[in-house]
Amino acid sequence: MHPKQICADIEMLGARLVLDGNDLYIENPENVYQELVEFVQSYKKRIIRYLKGEYSDQEHNVKQTIDKIINYYMGVAQDLNKKIDDWFNHDYESVMKVMKLLVLFWENGWRDLDTSVSNFESEETDKLSLEIYERAMSYFKGDKS
């Protein structure tokens, strides 16, 4: 989910996400239910980058693609699972890159597999994520080699 949407959803509840240096606070937290607070915490790093103006649409496209690939592996029903399955059946190298990426997230502390990898991203995972994204876009745009 785009951090912009998360911020908008919080504001609809009469609260606001506020940046204080490198930390994130919820103004009027009494207006936000606990599950949403936990959801916000799971996307904290991305939200902070967004509020600082450092989160581009291109970066979001890459991260959203990785989120969808992780959902695919977790067995989450998505419209594009068949497309991802087809891609992986034709692109072994991408499968290996995704496996390496998942190991990196694990090494960075990602243990609750039902939460976003957002807080476990690093320069190394960002670089590998971009490589995977570019391979996916190339495949889905017709270069199936």
Name each region found by the language model.
Residues 4-7, 23, 33, 39, ...:
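Phosphate/adenylate-binding glycine loop and adjacent helical scaffold
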Residues 9-33:
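Eukaryotic low-complexity, mixed-charge intrinsically disordered interaction/regulatory segments enriched
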